């Protein structure tokens, strides 16, 4: 795993600036989103010893979440544990939402969520604007989600993968560089679509 020391990722302002340029040509148009060519600065993940990671799980993912949190702290990360805190039955949307909210607000740089399959938590997290959650089950999906999709939340299925593989996925996911270049244009389109529908929802709410 790459040491927590290294170059920093693009700032939220830089990412928002790129998205805003895309939005200018999308909102109010019936045409598919168009993004400008170009890429944000190349970055290495993670950035520094102050990198803060939110973790969370339901009851099924609780044991694995605890182990991942311990290993992250050993590696020098600051960890915010959003629960759950026991084996008692709970609903995964509550904890997936808590983790995603910490990432979306900027309080935490990344999030890791564990449930039975990693799918439901990803669905919940991706409802939160600004979050790009990816369920990963091997090293290839971990690399792809970071390099190609600029994922900022990782979801894992405790019922599908063992503890050793889960930690390898976390290590890989945190160490892979965001690819930028052609991927930046595509991720900007994802963000543009998100903002387009957010604005539509706001107009309906204020109707």
Language-model features: locations:
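A short beta-strand-loop structural module common to alpha/beta enzyme folds
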Residues: 78-89
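Glycine-rich phosphate/diphosphate-binding loop of Rossmann-like nucleotide-binding domains
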Residues: 51-79
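N-terminal small/polar loop signature for handling phosphorylated ligands or for N-terminal nucleophile
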Residues: 90-111
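Short hydrophobic/aromatic-enriched beta-strand-loop microsegments
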Residues: 76-79, 131-138
